[in-house]
Amino acid sequence: MPGHHPHLYETLDDRFRTGKCASGDSKLELLYDGTRWAEGPVYVPAGRYLVWSDIPNDRLLRWDETTGSVGVFRSPAGHPNGNTLDAQGRLVTCEQGNRRVTRTEHDGSVTVIADRYRGKRLNSPNDATVRSDGSIWFSDPDFGITSDYEGHRADSEIGACNVYRVDPSTGEVTLAADGFLGPNGLVFSLDERRLYVSDSRANHIRVLDVDDDGAVTDDGEIFAACVGGTFDNIRFDDGGRLWAAAMGGGVHCYDPDGTLLGRILVPEIVANIRFGGAKRNRMFIAADTALYSVVLGVTGPPHLPVRR
C-alpha cells in the first residue's frame, strides 16, 4: 500500500546543505510495490502521470499523480528498460527483450526507431536521452541477452557494448562512443557540451566532450567512481549537479567538479531516477520491487527537450 517511509539524507560535503539539495520536511514516499525489477521512470507533464518499467514482468506501468492509482500502460512491452520523452512528448522506450528502441505515437501506435547497427541486431538497448536537436542517443549493453530473466538469451551480433546516435532527419543509427564494458545511464550536461555515461561493469561514470555538431570528440575521462556498488541511471538538476542511481548505495549527488556531496538512502537497490511533478522538484526512484518519490530542495531540467 502507498505510504510514507522515513528517509535519510547523508551529507558528505557542506555544499549538499548550502545548495539546499535536501528538503528537511520531505519524506520518502512509497508509491507502489509489486514489481520484480523496476526501471525507467519518466514523467509525462501533459497527463500528470508517470510511466515506468517492470522488466521481468514484461510490462510498462502507469502511476497517476492526481489519484495515486496504478495501472498497466502496456503489456507485453518487449521487456522494457529505460524510457524518456522526445520534444513532442512522445514516449521513447528501450525494449531490451525485443533488442530495439521504439517511440509510442500519440495515437498509441509504436514506431521502431532503431533495431540494428550496420545490419546487425542491437544487443539490448538500456537507456536513452534526447538532445535538443532531436537526435536520440542510447546505450546498448548486453545485459538483456545474457539470460532469460530480463530478455532472451542470445549471442551478441555486434560483439561490443556501445552508445549510439539516431539522426533526427534520416533515422540513421551511428556509433557515438565505444570502449565501454557495460554502458548504462546517459545524460547530457545542461549546455550539451558533455555526455555523461555510467559504465556499470567498470563501476564509474565517464564524461566525453561533444562538439557543436553533436559529435563526441574524445574518449572521455572518469568523472566519478562508485564505491560499494555500481552506477545505473544518471540525471542532472538545474544547478548542474549530477544525481546517480547507485545500486547498493541509494542515490548519489555530485557537484560539477566530481565531488560526492551527499546521498539519499533508500531501503532497496536503486536502478533509476527521474525529476518530475508540476514543479520538477519531485524525484521518482525506481528501486528493486517498488516505486518511491521524494520532494527535494532542487529542481530538474524541463520535462521535454528544448531546442537550443
Predicted features along the sequence, with ranges:
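Blade-edge beta-strand/turn elements of extracellular beta-propeller
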Residues: D14-D33, T67-P76, D107-G119, N162-G182, ...
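Beta-rich, blade/repeat-based domains predominating
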Residues: D25-K27, D33-R48, P76-E95, R100, ...
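Short loop/turn segments immediately following the C-termini of beta-strands
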Residues: I55, Q96, P141-D142, S200, ...
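A short loop-to-beta-strand structural motif that recurs across blades of beta-propeller domains
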Residues: R59-L61, R100-T102, C161-Y164, H204-R206, ...
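Flexible "stalk/tail and boundary" regions
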Residues: D64-E65, A87-Q88, T102-S109, I113, ...
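Short, conserved, GDST-rich strand-edge loop motifs in beta-rich repeat architectures
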Residues: F138-I158, L296
